[in-house]
């Protein structure tokens, strides 16, 4: 009977120890996420780039979870909550990426919510080219061979992001977006590639306007989401 009476006490200690270890693991993960050695990985896949300057080229995409920019027309809203995606070590991400391509595109979500230094340093140490797709709303981190900036009205890019941009990709959802695009174009370097891309759900309405605009303003280039037409990721 004495041994049996100790069972509840034993289980209480097990629960208490489990709680302590769980809290320690959460704290450890938090520090690793902050350091960038762990990232909330939504998905990763090898495909053909569908948009902008590198469309038609093969690349391995790393989609990082987490975004608070909040575009109402976002086609990957499931990426917004970083807690919905498994924390994955940068070493594991790099090891898998190396099997597929020497061109890596980091996208989101908003990847610059996280420290990109460990990821890009690891990728580049293995000879891979690093591209990023970002709103530019967060401080820059990482080493990038190509920087695609896509500003959003509700959370504008930093000055550093405008200075770094190799490509400016403006999403056109309505007529007002043309003037917003021109405002953003004034902030990038003269050699930055300028793209106008219709928001997918408005493409039939906005594409004729974009074509006319580009024909009158030839510094701009039409960008299509060709991967959606090809039915690939």
Language model features with spans:
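Hydrophobic alpha-helical membrane-insertion segments
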Residues: 1-4
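Acidic-enriched, low-complexity/disordered segments with a strong bias for Aspartate over Glutamate
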Residues: 6, 68, 75, 91, ...
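Flexible, acidic/Gly-rich N-terminal and inter-domain linker regions that tether
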Residues: 6-65, 70-73, 216, 221, ...
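Conserved Radical SAM active-site core
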Residues: 35-46, 58-61, 65-144
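Conserved AdoMet/S-adenosylmethionine-binding subsite of the radical SAM
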Residues: 112-233
């Amino acid at each position: 009977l004495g041994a049996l009476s100790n069972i509840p006490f034993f289980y209480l200690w097990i629960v208490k120890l489990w709680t302590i270890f769980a809290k320690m693991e959460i704290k450890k993960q938090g520090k690793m996420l902050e350091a960038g050695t762990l990232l909330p990985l939504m998905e990763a896949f090898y495909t053909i780039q569908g948009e902008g300057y590198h469309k038609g080229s093969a690349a391995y995409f790393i989609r990082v979870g987490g975004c608070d920019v909040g575009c109402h027309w976002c086609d990957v809203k499931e990426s917004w909550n970083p807690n919905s995606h498994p924390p994955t070590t940068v070493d594991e991400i790099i090891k898998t990426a190396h099997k597929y391509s020497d061109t890596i595109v980091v996208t989101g979500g908003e990847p610059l919510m996280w420290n990109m230094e460990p990821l890009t340093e690891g990728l580049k140490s293995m000879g891979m080219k690093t591209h990023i797709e970002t709103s530019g709303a967060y401080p820059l981190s990482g080493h990038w061979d190509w920087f695609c900036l896509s500003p959003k009205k509700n959370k504008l890019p930093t000055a550093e992001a405008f200075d770094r941009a190799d490509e400016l990709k403006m999403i056109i959802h309505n007529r007002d977006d043309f003037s917003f695009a021109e405002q953003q174009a004034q902030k990038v370097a003269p050699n930055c590639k300028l793209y106008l891309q219709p928001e997918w759900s408005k493409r039939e309405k906005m594409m004729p306007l974009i074509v006319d605009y580009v024909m009158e303003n030839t510094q701009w280039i039409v960008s299509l989401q060709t991967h959606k037409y090809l039915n690939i990721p």
